[in-house]
């Protein structure tokens, strides 16, 4: 679905056209004191809305942690307290993260970050139903400080014929009040409206006996706020209030009721592998440590900020992923910050098609042993430290099935550059970031490199290519039959829980998620992603997909082998015996499955030998360079 972040969804013909201060009136819902007067405006009200209160409540819960949707200056909001005990705090997420991975529980935050909620005010006719304390986290902590905020939820249900409702209709009301933890207006950061408190009120006149998301009733959403005494209302604040109201309505249109605690807009493929706050905190640290210098010294023809910050975001994810899998931590945390101070717990990485080498550089600087290769040397390599340059190789990957096929015809021709067949060291973690021709090869090369213990990997697809290297658009995956007894593997990592009964809400939720996936997989990028997943699963990988928080629309990460490797590494650390299995049989099975997939996928290009010839010819062109706009990565 297209993003209409800035689209106006309100009926602007109902607005007065006057400056907001001229339209203010006392709030009839929130009563203040002689020095605290809540106000609202008819220009801050939108009526005729079809959403039942449950939709607004669901959306409000979702926005509690995803405040970045309302402000580009913010990363997120961390939940510090929930009176219902439903939303997890960062400490609770870290503890769960440590228990399922190889992170030591002792390395998580020692104690809960306790912030007492502001006492809730009584609101006539309403019942207080929930209190949440959150901390707003800015994108630039050196410019803006975090801010705690108490959120109070109130509800009212007025029966037909009661005061405030008509004889025929029931009035249901939902009120959310947000109060920052500040002693004066000078403490309010730039990203927060200069207000003492802000409230959303949603009134729904329900004419239907049974509620639906678009029932026969009608709703009205209004904003109420508590300004500072004698403080003028600047134009910026007026724009902010209108934008907040508009965003709430726009998002409500796409909100589907959900049984999840995070709200109906929650994406099950986002933050499902690593907690959001861990990755973003690490990203902030890396950005301030490396971002400025890398952008300043950039020598490529491409835009530096896009590539630098994307690579730093991926690096942050990898650091936290490896913390979970291996118990490996950055050099700063080991008091060994500096070149070539590698964590002995980490087995090493290889960045295939490493491009500008920034990912390799930062990972090495952070204390993770590894190297990268690309078919063509980049100008950026020469500005990196010498020890990093030594680990960036100008080499072409020729898959072993191709070298074996060409061996019968005199071997691989001289390409004028070193070649290799991907025989990486045991336990090496493979990074395949926008590797184009190598994307679908990634799980295959990981298995062929070490069939007795296939290597773990992450692939971030970009441009679509066949195994021959030729550009190819994969067809969308076939939809599973409705009466199929087994669940389609492509959805296992999206939602592993199936409705235990014929509950309509649960069935509806499953149907919506399936429809969302179908739409994604019909695209070229979605079909490529699914192809990488299906190949990996076919040859024995337990695959997870996760939406990475990177500045790119090609942001789906396909992770293979994480769970198995995490379990194996935990057993090693605890000096437990390895699981009893027939190693030769496992190796032979993995090789057979990989070769069967290679032969099938290469059949469209004349078999393995024909695909090998295409691969070599394309590799020559990539090595020589094809001019700006046609090089790898310019899809």
Swiss-Prot record:
GO BP term, pick one: tRNA methylation
Biased composition (Basic and acidic residues): 480-493
Region forming the signal peptide: none
Gene Ontology CC entries for this record: cytoplasm
Keywords carried by this UniProt record: Cytoplasm, Methyltransferase, S-adenosyl-L-methionine, Transferase, tRNA processing
Pfam families: AdoMet_MTase (PF07757)
Superkingdom of the organism of origin: Eukaryota
UniProt region (Disordered), positions on chain: 1-28, 474-509
EC number: 2.1.1.211
GO molecular function: tRNA(Ser) (uridine(44)-2'-O-)-methyltransferase activity
Class of this enzyme: transferase
Cell compartment(s), UniProt: Cytoplasm
Family: Belongs to the TRM44 family.
Protein name: tRNA (uracil-O(2)-)-methyltransferase
Organism this protein belongs to: Aspergillus oryzae (strain ATCC 42149 / RIB 40)
């Amino acid at each position: 679905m297209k993003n209409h972040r800035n689209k106006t969804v309100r009926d602007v013909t109902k607005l007065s056209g006057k400056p907001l201060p001229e339209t203010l009136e006392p709030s009839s819902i929130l009563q203040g004191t002689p020095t605290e007067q809540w106000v609202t405006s008819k220009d801050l009200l939108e009526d005729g809305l079809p959403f039942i209160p449950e939709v607004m409540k669901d959306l409000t819960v979702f926005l509690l942690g995803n405040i970045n949707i309302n402000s580009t200056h913010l990363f997120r909001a961390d939940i510090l307290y929930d009176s219902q005990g439903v939303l997890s705090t960062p400490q609770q997420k870290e503890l769960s993260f440590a228990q399922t991975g190889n992170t030591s529980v002792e390395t998580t935050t020692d104690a809960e970050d306790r912030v007492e909620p502001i006492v809730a005010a009584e609101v006539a006719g309403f019942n207080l139903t929930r209190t949440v304390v959150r901390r707003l986290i800015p994108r630039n902590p050196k410019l803006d400080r975090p801010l705690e905020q108490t959120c109070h939820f109130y509800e009212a249900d007025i029966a037909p014929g009661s005061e405030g409702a008509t004889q025929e209709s029931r009035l249901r009301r939902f009120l959310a009040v947000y109060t920052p933890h500040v002693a004066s207006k000078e403490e309010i950061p730039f990203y927060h409206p200069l207000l003492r408190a802000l409230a959303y009120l949603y009134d729904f006149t329900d004419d239907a006996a049974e509620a639906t998301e678009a029932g026969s009733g009608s709703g009205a959403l209004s904003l109420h706020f508590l300004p500072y005494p004698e403080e003028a209302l600047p134009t910026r604040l007026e724009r902010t209030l209108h934008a907040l109201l508009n965003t709430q309505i726009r998002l409500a249109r796409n909100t589907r009721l959900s049984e999840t605690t995070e709200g109906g807009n929650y994406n099950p493929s986002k933050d499902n592998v690593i907690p959001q706050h861990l990755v973003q905190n690490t990203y902030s640290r890396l950005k301030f440590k490396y971002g400025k210098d890398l952008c300043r010294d950039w020598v490529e023809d491409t835009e530096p900020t896009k590539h630098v910050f994307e690579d730093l975001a991926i690096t942050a994810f990898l650091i936290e992923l490896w913390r979970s899998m291996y118990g490996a931590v950055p050099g700063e945390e080991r008091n060994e910050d500096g070149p070539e101070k590698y964590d002995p717990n980490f087995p090493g990485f290889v960045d295939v098609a490493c491009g500008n080498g920034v990912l390799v550089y930062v990972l090495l600087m952070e204390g993770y042993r590894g190297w990268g290769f690309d078919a063509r040397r980049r100008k950026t390599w020469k500005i990196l430290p010498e020890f990093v340059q030594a680990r960036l190789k100008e080499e072409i990957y020729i898959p072993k099935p191709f070298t074996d096929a060409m061996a019968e015809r005199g071997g691989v021709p001289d390409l004028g550059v070193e070649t290799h067949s991907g025989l990486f060291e045991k336990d090496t973690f493979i990074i395949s970031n926008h590797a184009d021709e190598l994307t679908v090869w990634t799980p295959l090369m990981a298995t062929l490199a070490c069939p007795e213990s296939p290597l773990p990997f992450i692939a971030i697809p970009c441009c679509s290519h066949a195994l021959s290297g030729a550009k190819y658009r994969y067809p969308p995956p076939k939809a599973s039959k409705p009466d199929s007894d087994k669940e389609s593997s492509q959805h296992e990592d999206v939602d592993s829980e199936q409705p235990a009964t014929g509950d309509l809400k649960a069935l509806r939720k499953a149907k919506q998620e399936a429809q969302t996936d179908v739409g994604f997989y019909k695209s070229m990028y979605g079909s490529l992603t699914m192809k990488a997943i299906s190949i990996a699963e076919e040859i024995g990988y337990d695959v997870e997909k996760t939406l990475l928080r990177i500045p790119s629309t090609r942001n789906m990460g396909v992770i293979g082998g994480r769970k198995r490797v995490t379990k194996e590494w935990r057993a090693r650390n605890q000096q437990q015996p390895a699981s009893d299995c027939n190693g030769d049989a496992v190796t032979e099975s993995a090789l057979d499955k990989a070769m069967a997939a290679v032969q099938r996928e290469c059949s469209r290009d004349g078999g393995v030998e024909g695909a090998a010839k295409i691969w070599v010819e394309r590799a020559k062109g990539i090595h020589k360079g094809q001019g700006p706009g046609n090089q790898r990565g310019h899809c």
